[in-house]
From Swiss-Prot:
Gene: APT1
Function as written in the Swiss-Prot or TrEMBL entry: Catalyzes a salvage reaction resulting in the formation of AMP, that is energically less costly than de novo synthesis. Contributes primarily to the recycling of adenine into adenylate nucleotides, but is also involved in the inactivation of cytokinins by phosphoribosylation. Catalyzes the conversion of cytokinins from free bases (active form) to the corresponding nucleotides (inactive form).
Known outcome of mutating P85T: In apt1-5; loss of activity
Effect recorded for G196R: In apt1-9; loss of activity and male sterility
UniProt-recorded name of the protein: Adenine phosphoribosyltransferase 1, chloroplastic
Chain segment of the transit peptide: 1-52
The entry's keywords: Acetylation, Chloroplast, Cytoplasm, Glycosyltransferase, Plastid, Purine salvage, Transferase, Transit peptide
Length: 243
């Protein structure tokens, strides 16, 4: 499996500052290892660029210019809310990215530039923030948008795939007939943490004969090693967490 990164800069969305025993499983999108201590500053002074040489050891760079100013703009537009939704959680809020029209536009443009000539007919968005980024990408590349939702959110007949959480399981669903065998799809979410949700989305689409071209996220939290759950499916991210 291959991970392609435009520029690794900031951690995103749900990152814990609380201590958690290393042998406990991590809830997707909600937990980070105890070694991660993240700044709650929005300024780019709190961000760190990885050199292209260092990054290339683990990941192929998607652009020759790893200091693309658009990436810095996207990274700095994400604010951190401490102790939300629970004490100890550093919630990295992408709503501030959406309020910044240039940063939001650049986010979509970077994905569109990557996928516009790859014969993609399906953009599958993972609930809930995949619904923000998926539709404009789908419209721009001439693909349909397929929502992948939590249980009992979609009317009519659905097909489901279960995945593991820290305590118990969850399920992701999509409509029967939303995709056809042989279609080419990308799966969009704002964040990959432990990778459980994206892995379930891959399995669900592959069960009905869809070819997964790639998973794409705004942010990767590499410390959680979520990309390892994606098997042979490559991962494309715009920014990467820096502890």
């Amino acid at each position: 499996m291959q991970t392609i990164i435009i520029s690794p800069l900031v951690s995103h969305r749900l990152c814990l500052a609380r201590a958690v025993p290393c042998n406990r499983l991590l809830n997707n999108h909600h937990r980070a290892p105890p070694s991660i201590r993240l700044s709650n500053h929005r300024s780019t002074t709190s961000l760190r660029l990885f050199s292209s040489a260092a990054a290339s050891r683990d990941s192929e760079m998607a652009t020759e210019d790893v200091q693309d100013p658009r990436i810095a703009k996207i990274a700095s537009s994400i604010r951190v809310i401490p102790d939300f939704p629970k004490p100890g959680i550093m919630f990295q809020d992408i709503t501030t990215l959406l309020l910044d029209t240039e940063a939001f536009k650049d986010t979509i443009a970077l994905f569109v530039d990557r996928y516009k000539d790859k014969g993609i007919s399906v953009v599958a968005g993972v609930e809930a923030r995949g619904f923000i980024f998926g539709p404009p990408i789908a419209l721009a590349i001439g693909a349909k948008f397929v929502p992948m939702r939590k249980p009992k959110k979609l009317p009519g007949k659905v097909i489901s795939e279960e995945y593991s959480l820290e305590y118990g399981t969850d399920t992701i669903e999509m409509h029967v007939g939303a995709v056809e065998p042989g279609e080419r799809a990308i799966i969009i979410d704002d964040l990959i943490a432990t990778g459980g949700t994206l892995a379930a989305a891959i399995r669900l689409l592959e069960r009905v004969g869809v070819k997964i071209v790639e998973c794409a996220c705004v942010i990767e939290l590499p410390e959680l090693k979520g990309k390892e759950k994606l098997g042979e499916t490559s991962l494309f991210v715009l920014v990467k967490s820096a502890a």
